[in-house]
Design a protein with these regions (language model features):
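Conserved GTP-binding G-domain of TRAFAC-class P-loop NTPases and closely related GTPase folds
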Residues: 3, 170-172, 176-308
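Extracellular structured ligand-interaction cores
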Residues: 61-63, 131, 218, 272
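Switch II of P-loop NTPase G domains
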Residues: 126-136, 140-177, 189-199, 203
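Short, flexible boundary segments at extreme N-termini or domain junctions of P-loop NTPases and their
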Residues: 1-71
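Short, flexible loop/turn elements at secondary-structure junctions
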Residues: 68-70, 138, 150-153, 279-282
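Conserved G1/Walker A P-loop phosphate-binding module
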Residues: 40-124, 141
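Short, flexible hinge/linker loops that cap or flank conserved catalytic cores
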Residues: 57-58, 137, 213
C-alpha cells in the first residue's frame, strides 16, 4: 500500500522505525466464562445492558476507550498498561465512583484490582476485570482514564447489527475528550472473528461509531497480537507498512471512514488516525490446564502510552 499516512496529531508510524503495540492471548480468552458476581455488573445488567448506570466524575481528563469485539485482548491490554505505568512511576487505580455506591459487585472488583493485575495467572483476570474505569495519575495529578467494558456491547459477532447500549452513547456524548482505541488482530487469533464477513461487519460498526464522534476525539487503531504475524523482525523492528496492509486486507473498508478530506493536508496525510501494534506477553499452559502469563517487552506499552 503506497503512501499510507494515518495521523491524529502525532507522527504516524508508516515506516518500520516508528511505534508499535499488540498482544498474544490467541484463542485463550474465548474459553473463559464470565461471572456476574465478579465482573462489575449485576445479573439484571448482564441480561439488559441498557440498564447499566455509570458516572464519569472527572470531566477534565480524556477517556481512553478500549473498543473491540469479545476476546480481542482489551482486558490484557489494560492489565499490561497498568503494570507498565506503575513501573515507571504512575499511579493507576480504579475509579470507585464509576458505578452506583450500592453496587457491591463493582466495589469488590475495585478492592481486588491490584491482586488481579499482579497475579501470574493473568488469563483468569480477564474473567473478572470486565467492566471498569481506571484512572492514571502522575504525582497526584490525574492524566487520563481507561474504560474497559465487555466486547459484546461494542460488537457482538452473533448479533452484529445490535445497537450500542445507552451507556456507550452516554460516553460518546459526554463532555470528556475521548481517545478511541479500536482493536484489530490477525484473522486466525480469535475464533469469534475468524471469517471475513464478520470482520467486515465489525468494520461497519466502526463506521457507525465514527459518525457519532466529536471532532475533538482521537482514534488509534491498535493491531493486537502482533507476535502472531510475520511482521515482527525483533523488538521495535516492525514492518508497519505490511501490518497496516494486512489490517486493510482482513477488515473490509475499515479505514474508509477516516479518510482525510482536507484538500491540502490529504496530500501527505491520507487518513486521520494513529496506528500502533501491541503484545501483552506470553501465555503458557500449565499442567493443571490454566495459563500463566509472562510479561512482554516494555517497548509495546511504552509506544502505546506515547501515542495516548
Amino acid at each position: 500500500m503506497a503512501d499510507f499516512e494515518p495521523n491524529s496529531g502525532a507522527a504516524a508510524p508508516a515506516q518500520n522505525t516508528k511505534p508499535a503495540s499488540i498482544q498474544s492471548q490467541s484463542h485463550i480468552f474465548g474459553k473463559i466464562s464470565t461471572s456476574p458476581e465478579t465482573n462489575g455488573l449485576s445479573g439484571e445488567e448482564m441480561r439488559d445492558p441498557n440498564k447499566i448506570k455509570i458516572t464519569i466524575a472527572d470531566t477534565s481528563i480524556p477517556i481512553v476507550v478500549l473498543f473491540g469485539p469479545p476476546s480481542c485482548g482489551k482486558t490484557m491490554t489494560l492489565i499490561r498498561m497498568t503494570r507498565f505505568l506503575r513501573s515507571v512511576g504512575y499511579t493507576v487505580e480504579p475509579d470507585r465512583s464509576f458505578r452506583p455506591s450500592t453496587d457491591g459487585h463493582y466495589e469488590n472488583l475495585c478492592d481486588n484490582f491490584d491482586n488481579m493485575v499482579s497475579q501470574i495467572e493473568a488469563a483468569d483476570s480477564t474473567d473478572k476485570i470486565n467492566f471498569m474505569l481506571v484512572k492514571v495519575f502522575k504525582e497526584g495529578k490525574p492524566i487520563c482514564q481507561f474504560l474497559e467494558s465487555p466486547g459484546e456491547y461494542y460488537f457482538k459477532p452473533s448479533d452484529p447489527y445490535a445497537q450500542f447500549p445507552f451507556y456507550i452513547n452516554d460516553i460518546i456524548n459526554n463532555k470528556n475528550r475521548k481517545i478511541w482505541v479500536l482493536f484489530t488482530e490477525p484473522s486466525h487469533t480469535n475464533r469469534l472473528m475468524s471469517d471475513s464477513q464478520t470482520r467486515g461487519l465489525y468494520s461497519q460498526k466502526i463506521s457507525k461509531l465514527k459518525s457519532k464522534l466529536s471532532s475533538r476525539d482521537r482514534v488509534i487503531f491498535l493491531n493486537n497480537k502482533i507476535d502472531e504475524t510475520p511482521f515482527v523482525n525483533g523488538i521495535g523492528k516492525i514492518n508497519y507498512r505490511q501490518a497496516i496492509k494486512d489490517v486493510q486486507n482482513n477488515y473490509d473498508n475499515i479505514f474508509a471512514p477516516f479518510k482525510n478530506l482536507n484538500p491540502i493536508t490529504k496530500l501527505w496525510q491520507e487518513y486521520r488516525f494513529d496506528f500502533v501494534v501491541f503484545q501483552s506477553g506470553d501465555f503458557v499452559k500449565t499442567e493443571d490446564g490454566s495459563y500463566s502469563f509472562s510479561v512482554g517487552n516494555d517497548y509495546y506499552p511504552k509506544k502505546l502510552w506515547e501515542f495516548l
